[in-house]
């Protein structure tokens, strides 16, 4: 699942369920469906499974304070014979997404301690389109970030900087 998160800076939280947690990466530019793009994905702490459908406002001053949108949701399956834990330890996770927005084959490759690259693999779901701009709304509520902030008592002006112009 992917959450669009307007905290101190706009980023996308890319999360894969593994056991009893959501293994998570912060992707500053958001995912790209263009196989030519390599997106930085910074490993962050695991999150509880209950966070998968959180959409709302985290109060300013708390960790991650800002507006959160459920930008994409779906399932994934690993490609190959390795377990998730083994692929994570080796620093190369190859998987197929079946989300509302993101589909097809993807790879996460570790390039440093916490640094990974998120890449779309060439397949029929690949495209030369900015998916984040083309499909900016929540998959749960169809709201933009500013709408979520308005409805949940957050900073509408700050949240709106994460919405398309």
Where are these regions (language model features)?
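A charge-rich, low-complexity, intrinsically flexible signal that marks solvent-exposed coils, linkers
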Residues: 1-165
């Amino acid at each position: 699942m992917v959450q669009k998160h307007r905290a101190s800076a706009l980023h996308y939280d890319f999360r894969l369920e593994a056991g009893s947690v959501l293994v998570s990466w912060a992707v500053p530019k958001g995912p790209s469906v263009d196989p030519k793009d390599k997106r930085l994905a910074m490993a962050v702490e695991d999150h509880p499974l209950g966070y998968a459908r959180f959409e709302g406002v985290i109060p300013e001053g708390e960790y991650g304070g800002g507006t959160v949108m459920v930008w994409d949701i779906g399932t994934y399956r690993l490609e190959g014979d390795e377990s998730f834990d083994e692929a994570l330890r080796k620093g190369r996770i190859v998987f197929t997404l079946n989300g509302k927005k993101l589909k097809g084959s993807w790879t996460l490759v570790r390039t440093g301690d916490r640094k990974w690259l998120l890449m779309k693999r060439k397949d029929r779901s690949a495209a030369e389109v900015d998916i984040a701009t083309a499909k900016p709304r929540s998959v749960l509520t169809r709201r933009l970030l500013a709408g979520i902030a308005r409805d949940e008592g957050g900073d509408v002006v700050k949240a709106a900087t994460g919405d398309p112009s």
